[in-house]
């Protein structure tokens, strides 16, 4: 269990509780979770973070009424900056989006501006929102993470409790390498409900070579770990930076969707540019 799982900042969340669904616009449904909850135990300070990045959200169940009452549908793309005070809690995001369903808006841009304003207010940070008509995305290919997949290893694993022990002495040699490693075996659990979160992760680094078996064992140790998606990615970045000490590091996870939303956080200390095309499980 995470050290802050019972923090008072989480007590008021609708997550894990029975809720009524509202279909008329209500910005108060949005709830934020302070990023400091997981950053403080990691020794990460808001004014001196070792990374930059965004939380990329895809909104698959977004609908509202136009001025004449005709339903509209769109796919939304949201990027929340890593410097925001709060992350957006996903169940509250879903409930908030449901409140658009029977609400009339004059045009698409009004919807976009409303989303941008409300999400920025909740997160207390910079955010960008784009809305796409379905025909703009039809035929878009399924993407994949570039890099070497480390999953096909003939190893025995019998420990699924989170530990950084596997990263001890996980680098070897003095030669500097630059490589991208990928795993589809990332599984963590919701901080509150403990429901499973499934993801693929891409780790791009420059530095002493990281032992792939030790890295895979470390990633598998998240299997019983309870944290939000964004928190897991920051923990992985921080652990790799601390134990492996790469010159450059980027960590990017794309999680499967739940409630019509998928969350795809990335953190980097280099000029990393994430691919935003959905993966096969998304």
Curated annotation (Swiss-Prot):
NADPH binds at residues 90-91, 258-259. InterPro entries: GTP-CH-I_C/QueF (IPR043133), NADPH_dep_7-cyano-7-deazaG_red (IPR050084), QueF (IPR029500), QueF_N (IPR029139), QueF_type2 (IPR016428). Its EC number is 1.7.1.13. It is an enzyme of class 1 (oxidoreductase). GO terms for biological process: queuosine biosynthetic process; tRNA modification. NCBIfam families: QueF. Homodimer. This is NADPH-dependent 7-cyano-7-deazaguanine reductase. The gene is queF.
């Amino acid at each position: 269990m995470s050290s802050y799982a019972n923090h008072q900042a989480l007590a008021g969340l609708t997550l894990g509780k029975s809720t009524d669904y509202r279909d008329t616009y209500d910005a108060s449904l949005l709830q934020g979770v302070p990023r400091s909850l997981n950053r403080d135990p990691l020794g990460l300070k808001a004014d001196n973070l070792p990374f930059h990045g965004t939380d990329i959200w895809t909104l698959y169940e977004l609908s509202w009424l136009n001025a004449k009452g005709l339903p509209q549908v769109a796919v939304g793309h949201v990027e929340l900056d890593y410097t925001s005070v709060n992350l957006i809690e996903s169940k509250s995001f879903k409930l908030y989006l449901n409140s658009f369903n029977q609400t009339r808006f004059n045009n698409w841009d009004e919807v976009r501006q409303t989303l941008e304003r409300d999400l920025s207010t909740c997160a207390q940070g910079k955010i960008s929102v784009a809305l796409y008509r379905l025909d703009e995305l039809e035929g878009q290919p399924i993407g994949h993470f570039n890099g070497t997949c480390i999953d096909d290893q003939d190893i025995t694993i019998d420990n699924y409790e989170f530990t950084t022990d596997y990263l001890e002495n996980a680098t070897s040699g003095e030669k500097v390498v630059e490589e991208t490693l990928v795993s589809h075996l990332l599984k963590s659990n919701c901080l509150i409900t403990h429901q499973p979160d499934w993801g693929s992760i891409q780790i791009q680094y420059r530095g002493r070579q990281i032992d792939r078996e030790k890295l895979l064992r470390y990633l598998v140790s998240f299997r019983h770990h309870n944290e939000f998606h964004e928190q897991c990615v920051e923990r992985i970045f921080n652990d790799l930076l601390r134990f492996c000490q790469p010159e450059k590091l980027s960590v990017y996870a794309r999680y499967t969707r739940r409630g019509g939303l998928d969350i795809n956080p990335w953190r980097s200390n280099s000029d990393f540019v994430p691919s935003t095309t959905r993966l096969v499980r998304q």
